[in-house]
């Protein structure tokens, strides 16, 4: 993950709630590739390191650079990854980092939408990937046949929020930010996320020089088990950039009030108020691309 405010994430809670959503996505992305076990990989926005564990197991003879800018996430990742000697944990923005070697794979799960400048990110990634002729003559570094085909080249394996992501949730959040109680706190509000379109992303990749790209959106509406888990997920992940603006002497009370209003809106907009479904309307942007 990549974040605006260093040390601003509740990494311990994120470590718990992300098992229900982000961890599942990360496992799916790992299956896009036929792994050989000796790849040099960057986990761009590793968060608490949960999916980095699985990535490290994929490359026992390789190396994983687990990169995140948030100090709390880095601390949690160190705790989660202490048993792996093929993982190096680095606190940095993944668009500014300088690594000592070129990469076979750049993996990123639920992080790229925190970066506003995707052109810069993809250009940085391009510069970090090995060109084909220096790729150690691997016979096959492609992805599974239902993705981008088998191509002997370095590659991106990325999933993040895409165009339309959380639109229903954002609509409810904006009702609260525009309310009399909270309008003043959000007068200079700018959305922290950039949810890109698939066509725009594919065009950008090709302009930089990537080949054999496969870029597509898919909807993934997630239903969380109950009010308590949903509330923790919203507070820790979805509403985080909104809650950060409520930093005053009464910050905790304001955040509690904001969350209560949001949950009230969810209940009010439920089609069956006697049996509320705690839904998250995700849209995922899936990206596989190769550096020739």
Feature locations, PLM:
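Conserved catalytic/acceptor-binding region of the Class I
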Residues: 119, 130, 134-142, 148-227
């Amino acid at each position: 993950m990549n974040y605006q405010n260093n040390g601003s994430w509740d990494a311990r809670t994120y470590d718990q709630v992300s098992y229900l959503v982000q961890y599942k996505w990360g496992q799916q992305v790992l299956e896009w590739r036929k792994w050989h076990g000796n790849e040099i990989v960057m986990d761009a926005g590793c968060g608490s390191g949960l999916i980095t564990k699985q990535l490290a197991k994929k490359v026992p003879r390789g190396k994983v650079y687990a990169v995140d800018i948030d100090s709390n996430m880095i601390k949690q990742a160190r705790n989660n990854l202490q048993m792996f000697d093929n993982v190096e944990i680095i606190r940095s923005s993944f668009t500014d980092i300088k690594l000592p070697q070129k990469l076979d794979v750049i993996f990123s799960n639920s992080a790229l939408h925190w970066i506003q400048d995707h052109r810069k990110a993809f250009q940085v990634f391009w510069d970090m990937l090995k060109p084909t002729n220096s790729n150690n003559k691997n016979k096959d570094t492609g992805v599974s046949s239902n993705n981008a085909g088998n191509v002997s080249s370095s590659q991106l394996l990325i999933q993040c929020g895409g165009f339309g992501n959380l639109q229903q949730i954002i609509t409810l959040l904006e009702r609260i930010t525009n309310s009399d109680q909270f309008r003043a706190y959000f007068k200079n509000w700018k959305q922290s996320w950039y949810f890109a379109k698939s066509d725009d992303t594919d065009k950008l990749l090709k302009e930089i020089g990537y080949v054999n790209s496969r870029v597509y959106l898919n909807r993934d509406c997630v239903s969380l088990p109950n009010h308590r888990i949903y509330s923790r997920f919203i507070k820790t992940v979805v509403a985080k950039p909104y809650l950060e603006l409520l930093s005053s002497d009464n910050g905790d009370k304001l955040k509690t009030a904001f969350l209560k209003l949001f949950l009230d809106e969810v209940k009010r907009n439920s089609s069956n108020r006697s049996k509320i479904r705690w839904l998250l309307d995700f849209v995922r942007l899936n990206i596989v691309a190769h550096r020739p």
